[in-house]
Structures are given as C-alpha cells and as structure tokens.
Amino acid sequence: MARVTVEDCIDKVENRFDLVLLASHRARQISQGEQITIDRDNDKNPVVALREIADETLSPGDLKEALIHSLQKHVEVDEPEADLPQIASQAEETPDAELAPEENIAFDRMSEEELLAGIEGLVPPEKNDDF
C-alpha cells in the first residue's frame, strides 16, 4: 500500500475521530519504543500506525483499551468482596500491640544535595531515529 488514507481504515474503525485518536496513540507508542507489526518502508510513525490499522495487524479494540488506560489517572481495582469479612474478623482478633509496628515505618530521607547529585548522575536516553 503506497499511501494510506482514511478510507483504507474506515471499515476497521467506523468513526474518523476515533481513528485519529487510535492512530495517534499508536504512533506515540511506536515513538516510545513499541515494536511495529509491519515493515516500516521508510514511513513515519503516524503512517505506520495507520497501515497497522488498515492491515488489521492490531485490533482497534485493544488500541482503544490501551488509549483509555494511558489516559486514566486513577485505576480502580475490583477486589472480591468475599475476602472483606475474613479480613475484618482477623483484625478484631489481632491485639493492638501487633498493629503498632506499622506506625513505626520509617521512610528514607534524602537531602536536596543528594537528590541533585542523583539527577546529575542519570544517563539521558539514546536518540531514536523514529522521530
């Protein structure tokens, strides 16, 4: 496929705006180092993303889930409710003396100088030709 147009992808993702969101998210993933599923053919990341969608090497549903997950700031974890009564009954049986060590947890403290020295010691990431 020499040129990828929206018409090549519109039968995979019906809404053009959703297609733009998914393709741009995939292009960002490629820029961050994700493996591409097709030959690059000297194309830029947005074109590669559109070609992946058009060739159906990626599922639009999976891309949509990845996009939603990347935009979420707080992810709720569903925990089974059956475990809650057991935990509550164990807490009632546990004396307060056993709970005290949790309050004595100490966190490492770092001075500003140590923080700056650590930042200066960081190695910048390697340049990537995908841009």
UniProtKB/Swiss-Prot annotation:
Alphabetic keyword roster: DNA-directed RNA polymerase, Nucleotidyltransferase, Transcription, Transferase
Molecular function GO labels: DNA binding; DNA-directed RNA polymerase activity
Reaction catalysed by this enzyme: RNA(n) + a ribonucleoside 5'-triphosphate = RNA(n+1) + diphosphate
Entry's Gene Ontology BP terms: DNA-templated transcription
Gene3D superfamilies: 3.90.940.10
Gene Ontology CC entries for this record: DNA-directed RNA polymerase complex
Pfam families linked: RNA_pol_Rpb6 (PF01192)
Assembly mode: The RNAP catalytic core consists of 2 alpha, 1 beta, 1 beta' and 1 omega subunit. When a sigma factor is associated with the core the holoenzyme is formed, which can initiate transcription.
Assigned protein family: Belongs to the RNA polymerase subunit omega family.
Protein name: DNA-directed RNA polymerase subunit omega
Species of provenance: Chelativorans sp. (strain BNC1)
